[in-house]
Amino acid sequence: MARIAGVDLPRDKRVEVGLTYIFGIGRKTSNNILAAAGINPDTRIKDLTEEEVNNLRRIIDADHHVEGDLRREIALNIKRLKEIRCYRGIRHIKGLPVRGQKTKTNARTRKGPKKTVGRKKKK
């Protein structure tokens, strides 16, 4: 099993798909990395030589923010928004959608389960 950026890549997957198991690398970035390394995207991870794995490791470490560094950067950005109390920061604090979605009917993922409000019965 190839280990790149602290992630064990699945041996039976194609390299193009296997690299997407690393946080911060999607299909497009994966293809760009493989083009820079000169590796065929259809190759299976188990068929990579040690030299090719080291080359991939070097390219990812040099050119891309991945895994822990990227998670830390995102968390710091959100923390900064909260500290300066801008609109987006306040939405993060309140647990509401940040990117302008409507909240009258949907947004259950951010708001959590519905809290039913009781009503007094008429006599």
From Swiss-Prot:
Bias kind Basic residues: ranges: 101-123
Entries under SUPFAM superfamilies matching the protein: S13-like H2TH domain (SSF46946)
Residues in coiled coil: none
Molecular functions per Gene Ontology: rRNA binding; structural constituent of ribosome; tRNA binding
Keyword terms of this UniProt record: Ribonucleoprotein, Ribosomal protein, RNA-binding, rRNA-binding, tRNA-binding
One Gene Ontology term from the biological process aspect of the record: translation
InterPro entries: Rbsml_uS13_C, Ribosomal_uS13, Ribosomal_uS13-like_H2TH, Ribosomal_uS13_bac-type, Ribosomal_uS13_CS
Keyword Plastid: no
Family annotation (Gene3D superfamilies): 1.10.8.50, 30s ribosomal protein s13, domain 2 (4.10.910.10)
GO cellular component, one term: cytosol
Region (Disordered): 97-123
Disulfide pairings: none
Binding partners and assembly: Part of the 30S ribosomal subunit. Forms a loose heterodimer with protein S19. Forms two bridges to the 50S subunit in the 70S ribosome.
Family classification: Belongs to the universal ribosomal protein uS13 family.
Role description: Located at the top of the head of the 30S subunit, it contacts several helices of the 16S rRNA. In the 70S ribosome it contacts the 23S rRNA (bridge B1a) and protein L5 of the 50S subunit (bridge B1b), connecting the 2 subunits; these bridges are implicated in subunit movement. Contacts the tRNAs in the A and P-sites.
Protein name per Swiss-Prot or TrEMBL: Small ribosomal subunit protein uS13
